[in-house]
């Protein structure tokens, strides 16, 4: 393996926000392949996110976005552990991106666990009826229903949605990457999306 250049370490750091040593290690582990190194850092960020998941998040910001036409607005609660992180450029950028995501993708809730039970039951029944009408056996129909429910989560659950600026990553991936970089637990709390002329 060739030596990792300082330029490639800097490029990876600029792209991910991870520390210099983490970037160098990621490039070393991935034989200098930047895309694989980004994935490696994401995985590392995920493990950091899991370690920090139980820590209290009593600080944060209310991220907001108002569309340029003034007819669509979003407010979202983004929580972290310290006011130092809450004021950081990276955290504020994340809050802005999440608010823009909500404006564009109109999620129903943050996590799959928050999907209203009546909505989920109704959708499962529709998916099952569709599968049965397609002539699928009961056991296969259930697997089809599970697959369609996962697809539904990607449409209506904020953390499962593909990021509007890069559909290769989800909002959950983005949040876990932020946790890996800042070293604190981050949570998305409540959100409100208002569009002129839409019923609440």
UniProtKB/Swiss-Prot annotation:
Q: Does the keyword Calcium apply?
A: no
Please give the Gene Ontology molecular function terms for this protein: translation elongation factor activity
Q: Where is this region: Involved in Mg(2+) ion dislocation from EF-Tu?
A: 82-85
PANTHER family per the UniProt record, alphabetical: ELONGATION FACTOR TS (PTHR11741), ELONGATION FACTOR TS, MITOCHONDRIAL (PTHR11741:SF0)
UniProt record similarity statement: Belongs to the EF-Ts family.
Species this chain originates from? Solidesulfovibrio magneticus (strain ATCC 700980 / DSM 13731 / RS-1) (Desulfovibrio magneticus)
Among PROSITE patterns, the record links this protein to: EF_TS_1, EF_TS_2
Task: Please state the protein's primary subcellular location.
Answer: cytoplasm
Keywords from UniProt, A to Z, are: Cytoplasm, Elongation factor, Protein biosynthesis
| Name under which the protein is recorded | Elongation factor Ts
Q: What does this protein do?
A: Associates with the EF-Tu.GDP complex and induces the exchange of GDP to GTP. It remains bound to the aminoacyl-tRNA.EF-Tu.GTP complex up to the GTP hydrolysis stage on the ribosome.
Subcellular location, in the record's words? Cytoplasm
GO (cellular component) term, any one: cytoplasm
What superkingdom heads the lineage?
Answer: Bacteria
Cited Gene3D superfamilies: 1.10.286.20, DNA helicase RuvA subunit, C-terminal domain, Elongation factor Ts, dimerisation domain
- Recall the taxonomic lineage recorded for the source organism: Bacteria, Pseudomonadati, Thermodesulfobacteriota, Desulfovibrionia, Desulfovibrionales
Checking InterPro entries in the record gives: EF-Ts_dimer_sf, Transl_elong_EFTs/EF1B, Transl_elong_EFTs/EF1B_dimer, Transl_elong_Ts_CS, UBA-like_sf
């Amino acid at each position: 393996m060739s030596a990792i250049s300082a330029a490639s370490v800097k490029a990876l750091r600029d792209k991910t926000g991870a520390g210099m040593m983490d970037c160098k290690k990621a490039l070393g582990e991935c034989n200098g392949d930047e895309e694989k190194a980004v994935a490696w850092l994401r995985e590392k960020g995920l493990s950091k996110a899991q370690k920090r998941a139980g820590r209290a998040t009593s600080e944060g910001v209310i991220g907001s976005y108002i569309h340029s036409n003034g007819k669509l607005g979003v407010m979202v609660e983004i929580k972290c552990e310290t006011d130092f992180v809450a004021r950081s450029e990276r955290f504020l950028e994340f809050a802005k991106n999440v608010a823009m995501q909500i404006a564009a993708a109109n999620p129903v809730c943050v996590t799959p666990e928050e999907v209203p039970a009546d909505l989920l039951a109704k959708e499962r029944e529709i998916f099952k009826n569709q599968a049965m009408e397609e002539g699928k056996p009961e056991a296969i129909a259930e697997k089809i229903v599970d697959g369609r429910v996962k697809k539904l989560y990607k449409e209506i659950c904020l953390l499962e949605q593909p990021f509007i600026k890069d559909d290769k990553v989800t909002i959950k991936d983005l949040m876990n990457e932020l946790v890996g970089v800042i070293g604190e637990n981050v949570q998305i709390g409540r959100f409100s999306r208002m569009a002129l002329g839409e019923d609440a």
